């Protein structure tokens, strides 16, 4: 089964992705200066496509592949 992203969400500290296999990965905003200093309203203004998550107004992109390459696996749902 090919891994696909079924859900993307944020909280005050990170952006999360969930795969069709139930895996959840995250990237902390603190690791990205533009995201770390952004206002909550700016963080909430993101778009998703088949490659990753983009914050157009902040000029920041995070690829899904990058989420999954790191040891950031949280837990199955």
Per-range role (PLM):
Residues 1-77:
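Motif-centric detector for short Cys/His coordination patterns
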